[in-house]
Amino acid sequence: MKRKLKWIAVALVAGFALLQLTNPSRTNPLVVRDLMAANPPPPPIAAMLHAACYDCHSSETRWPWYSHVAPMSWLIAHDVTEGRQHLNLSVWPGDDPVRAVKLLDKMSDAIGNGEMPLDKYTKLHADARLTEVQRKELTDWLDGESARLKSGVGK
């Protein structure tokens, strides 16, 4: 019985080691035009956006140590890829106010409804947890930027 457990343990360790050879790409593509460059927020709003949104929705992802360990590396790379596909704050449509308004409204709705940031993210990133007051401040800013763009008023 002990011999069988030993072989099982060796096989599991070897399998885990082999998994490490298949790490996905963890890249941060070039920032084209950032939301905060196009629509500079006040410092507290900028800090909230960076903490709660930028790891999954920008080219400024902070890759934690566990993003280098399979199978977590696959899950994190998938989540970041999916997040960037839905909304990439590093590729902001500054020259397309109609699209920018849609994205700002989508962000405001997701944050205001508590859909974002995702619970699975905030469990490991306490700085990304938003209080109700912070959610209100953030959605007020997003709604204000949306209204400003709708009215065609520049900064």
Q: PLM features: residue spans?
A:
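C-terminal capping alpha-helices of c-type cytochrome domains
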Residues: 114-115, 122-153
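Electrostatic cytochrome c docking/interface patches
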Residues: 28-49
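Acidic helix-start/capping segments at beta-turn-to-alpha-helix junctions
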Residues: 63-78
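Hydrophobic membrane-insertion alpha-helices, especially the h-region
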Residues: 6-23
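Extracytoplasmic/secreted proteins, especially bacterial periplasmic and envelope-associated proteins
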Residues: 44, 48, 71, 75, ...
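The canonical Cys-X-X-Cys-His
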Residues: 49-61, 116, 138
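Extracytoplasmic electron-transfer domains, predominantly the class I c-type cytochrome c fold
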Residues: 74-124
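A charge-rich, low-complexity, intrinsically flexible signal that marks solvent-exposed coils, linkers
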Residues: 28-32, 86, 111, 149
